[in-house]
Every structure is written in structure tokens, then in C-alpha cells.
Amino acid sequence: MIDADRLITAAGGRDRDEQMDRAIRPLSLADYIGQPTVREQMELFIQAARGRNEALDHTLIFGPPGLGKTTLANIIAQEMGVSIKSTSGPVLERPGDLAAILTNLEPNDVLFIDEIHRLSPIVEEVLYPAMEDFQLDIMIGEGPAARSIKLDLPPFTLVGATTRAGMLTNPLRDRFGIVQRLEFYNIADLSTIVSRSAGILGLVIEPQGAFEIARRARGTPRIANRLLRRVRDFAEVRGNGQITRQTADKALNLLDVDEHGFDHQDRRLLLTMIEKFDGGPVGVDSLAAAISEERHTIEDVLEPYLIQQGYIMRTPRGRVVTRHAYLHFGLNIPSRMGEMPVVDDVVDDPADL
């Protein structure tokens, strides 16, 4: 199983880290760094909804973990000047669980459902009329005496977040008027995020120190902030408390996070594909068995960044490593791979951005 304390996983961390994440989380679109298209569109939609004094259209936010889906949901509520009620798909086990939340919403409030793809079908059925007509259908009684009653709900905005938009049913997906995909962040934006977080936490950090952390953060703000906290520990214990590029480099090397942002889990996945499956193609179930991981861990946690950086390809026959992976480990590239082009995404200096 994947390590619970894996530094570069984008999953939620320990309670203390989560508290610090909340402290450095932006509260407005003006403070929201990166995702320029999403930010510009949401500014427009929110301004229009506020001008009409209406609830914002239901909004679906999807993308890999750690890119700020929850942050954006809270910003939407803040910008709309309304309250937000937060829950998650697995928590809503029965229609009554959802009904209890919906009936306590005020006009134009935001209901945020994380992992919305994990809603049970019976709960999802209750959600349809609530989203479309702002009505709640409730069954009273049991057996032949059971009857349905309709309750009117105040207008509200459902914000759904998911890492697996393809698992949403078509009827649910079609009821979202706004759909936003969050992309991996570039190093420049991540450097800005690291510098901002350091300022909020009262840390002294040089621009190149922020850059060094950012380039190893796998394009993910949550990972960047987590690495910042661990580099801070290193700087306080083995340095003078100031985060320089040299300090960040030493700290991250000690933590086994290389210049590509890979840790031992990523390297194990790539080496398993190369050594046990001759580079692929290999099915995800076979790969999961070989490295003793669950299928969804590979698909949701390990693969997205490796694919985005060009180390793995998905093909109809299975996963295949690219020339990038062989070069990363200093291995000879099999002649059968041909002359595929190599694109080096590692930036060695901030001036190259």
C-alpha cells in the first residue's frame, strides 16, 4: 500500500498540516494564483450572478488531487457573499442525509460535495430535482401507505469536486451549468505560491529557494506547501532558518524527492515496468499486483503526473514507459522504441522560465 506519510502525495495530510493549509488558503479570486482561464471565467460568472442577485449556476470542478478544488469552492462562496456547507459523496449514504443539508440552506448558499463521483445512485436521484427545480421529493411512510411529498428549496449553488469526472453519470454531469478543469501548475506560479505561503508562515525564503521547492512539487500546490514545511524543518535544525536554494536542495535530497519531483514510489513504478514487463505494454491490474498497490492508487495518485510529464503512455494494450523513463535511470533505450523525441521538462534556472 502507498505510504500514508508520502511527502509528494496530493492526498490530505495530518491534522496539523491541514490546519496550516487552511491558514494559507486564499480567500478571494484576487489572491488565487494560477489557472488564469478558470479565474477569469469565474470572475465573470460570479459578477453576473451577483448583479442579478441570483445563485451561481451549479459548478463542477475536476482535476488531479491537490490542485485547489476545495479552495476554489470556498472562494466561490466568499465572492458570492454566502455561506458554504461542505460534505463528501461517501458521507451521504441515504437520501435523508442529503435532505437534512438541503433543507438548512439559505438562499444562494453554496453546497460543496467533494468526491461527488462517489454518490450512491439513490442519493443522486434525490439530487436531480433539487438541482433542476429546487425541489426535494421525500417519501413518507412505508409500504402501501407510503406517499411522496415535495418541499420547495431556496435557490442554491451545488459545487461538485472530483478527480474522476468520467465516473459521473450523464444525468448528473448535464445538470452542471459551469464545468471547470484544473490543470497542473507551472513552476512560476508554484514559486509564487511557495513565496506567499512562506510569508504567511513568517519564514525567510529566497526566490531561488522557492523555485527549488516549486520545481519538485509535481505541479501541485498542496505538495509545494507540504515540501515547504519540511524544508522549513531542515532549515531550522541544520541551517540558520533561512530557506535558500542550497538549503532546499539538501532538504529535498534528504527527503528522497529528486529534481523531477519523483520519490521512491514513482521510481518503483517506472522500474517495475522496465525490469519486469520490458517497458510494457502492461495492464493496470498486473502492474498493481506487481507493486502491491491498489488500481485506483495507480490511476489517481501515481500515473497522472508521470503521464503529464511524458514518462508513461496509455495505449489500447496497456501502459508503456517512454524513452524519458530509460534516460531518467541512465538505462539503454531499447532499439524497438525507435527515435521518439525527448522533451526535457526540467528547468535548471528560474531565468529559463
From Swiss-Prot:
Q: Which Gene3D superfamilies match?
A: 1.10.8.60, P-loop containing nucleotide triphosphate hydrolases, Winged helix-like DNA-binding domain superfamily/Winged helix DNA-binding domain
Name the positions where Mg(2+) binds: T70
Q: Map out region (Small ATPAse domain (RuvB-S)) in residue numbers.
A: 186-256
Q: Tell me which CDD domains the record gives.
A: AAA
* Enzyme Commission number: 3.6.4.-
| Taxonomy, superkingdom | Bacteria
Residues where DNA binds: R295, R314, R319
Question: Where located?
Answer: Cytoplasm
SUPFAM superfamilies in the record, alphabetically? P-loop containing nucleoside triphosphate hydrolases (SSF52540), Winged helix' DNA-binding domain (SSF46785)
What GO annotations for molecular function exist for this entry?
ATP binding; ATP hydrolysis activity; four-way junction DNA binding; four-way junction helicase activity
Question: What is the documented function of this protein?
Answer: The RuvA-RuvB-RuvC complex processes Holliday junction (HJ) DNA during genetic recombination and DNA repair, while the RuvA-RuvB complex plays an important role in the rescue of blocked DNA replication forks via replication fork reversal (RFR). RuvA specifically binds to HJ cruciform DNA, conferring on it an open structure. The RuvB hexamer acts as an ATP-dependent pump, pulling dsDNA into and through the RuvAB complex. RuvB forms 2 homohexamers on either side of HJ DNA bound by 1 or 2 RuvA tetramers; 4 subunits per hexamer contact DNA at a time.
The annotated subunit structure for this chain is:
Homohexamer. Forms an RuvA(8)-RuvB(12)-Holliday junction (HJ) complex. HJ DNA is sandwiched between 2 RuvA tetramers; dsDNA enters through RuvA and exits via RuvB. An RuvB hexamer assembles on each DNA strand where it exits the tetramer. Each RuvB hexamer is contacted by two RuvA subunits (via domain III) on 2 adjacent RuvB subunits; this complex drives branch migration. In the full resolvosome a probable DNA-RuvA(4)-RuvB(12)-RuvC(2) complex forms which resolves the HJ.
Q: What is this protein called?
A: Holliday junction branch migration complex subunit RuvB
Upper lineage: Bacteria, Pseudomonadati, Pseudomonadota, Gammaproteobacteria, Pseudomonadales
